[in-house]
Amino acid sequence: MELEAFYPHPALVTKTTPVEKPRFPAIDAHNHLGDEFGGGWIHRPLAVLLDMLDASDIRLYVDLDGSWSEAALQEHLEHLGPASDRFRVFGGVDWSQWTEKGDKFAEWVASRLRVQKGYGAAGLKVWKISGCTSTIIEANW
């Protein structure tokens, strides 16, 4: 028999346990609502998202997509604002400014993070790739 003609038939029989609802409430501590990783939930009605979270008994949702830019942070905070008790949105650092800011980069980042906190950011998302691609050529910190 040629491999392309081989279609195995499952023979294992196990007990099926339908799960109607979650056993415990949950916090989704790492997720995305934006287009890049989150399926564009940020553009869908908030009520639809809340219904889905309620069905899964997710009590709190941490959205990391505010870290793309301050504009994205503000968009996410505005969209989720009516249910702000259910969401935490993280901000981020614009690493592209490192070269331009030079020795002032750390001070600049601290000032931007204070601004983001003022917008309502609940934390800071540091992308893994940042540590792999950002390097200090010369700094006097």
Question: Whereabouts are the PLM-identified features?
Answer:
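Active-site gating/metal-coordination segments in enzymes
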Residues: M1-E4, P8, A72-W141
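An N-terminally biased module of ancient metal coordination in phosphate/nucleic-acid-related enzymes
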Residues: M1-P82
